[in-house]
Amino acid sequence: MAYIYETHLHTCQASACGRSPGRDYIQRYIDAGYSGIIVTDHFYRGNCRIDRSLPWRDFIDRFCAGYEDARNEGEKRGFPVFFGWEENFDGDEYLIYGLDKAWMLRHPEMPTWTRKQQYEIVRAAGGCVVQAHPFRARDYNHTIYLSHALCDGVEVYNAGNEPDWNRLAMRYAKIIGLPVTAGSDNHCADTMQPDRLAGVCFDKPLEDIQGYVAAILNRQTFSLHLPVALEPWNGSVAPDLPCRWLDREGEDTGRDIMEILRRGTPAEK
């Protein structure tokens, strides 16, 4: 039996782009055959709905409301709901897993972190970082930043992406040798279509979010749940935006992204 989990989902309580409260997703994911979801609302520097002028405790309380709404409904129905978030830097976004509300309350400096600080502090606390939809080109980003040394995995299939962006992400992940994930990037329970959802599959159910973190960090075997097959990159499709290949300090290396993609040159961490 396959246990399918959603890894990328937004609620209207915390994400400005979210269209549904957390509780509305539960029965729909049960009906779609999922075994659990991870709520990953947009955090401070992303498309967050919460007033950033609030005191830190109030900000975090409100930020976690969508997750808590989903969790409470999930508990009523015996459906696991785990916590995460999505943070933005310069259009490049990262899914954070394995930490909780209490931890966030102890870190009011989070909005000032660099990519490097985020990675090092999250890892030291027992969490992990996955770069979301790395080749996405939207009106909110003008450059693609590839942070291979400052993440633990790559979201290679995002249901909100153009197919070429996902193909580029898979090629990139194979070159750098990081675990790959998939997610729906779901924003609305009312319009979600089961045959378009994505996620990850395990042979055994996840007991908690740490099980997912361990699977990524320890490179345990799990598969991707995809609505369509992810075709390989054909060598000719280029990113839609200028790319910056960042080093372990978060600085631009000046490397040619297309050369790396075509030659398959491994990157040093």
Enumerate the predicted regions with their spans:
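C-terminal active-site-proximal or functional interface alpha/beta core segments in diverse enzymes
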Residues: 60-64, 104, 108-120
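An N-terminally biased module of ancient metal coordination in phosphate/nucleic-acid-related enzymes
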Residues: 1-88, 148-149, 163, 188-190, ...
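Conserved beta-strand positions in the central sheet of alpha/beta enzyme cores
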Residues: 38-39, 130-131, 155
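Generic beta-sheet signal
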Residues: 84, 132, 183-184
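Short, flexible loop segments at the rims of nucleotide/cofactor-binding pockets, characterized by
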Residues: 13-16, 59, 105-109, 131-134, ...
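Surface-exposed amphipathic alpha-helices with a cationic face
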Residues: 4, 30, 71-75, 116-130, ...
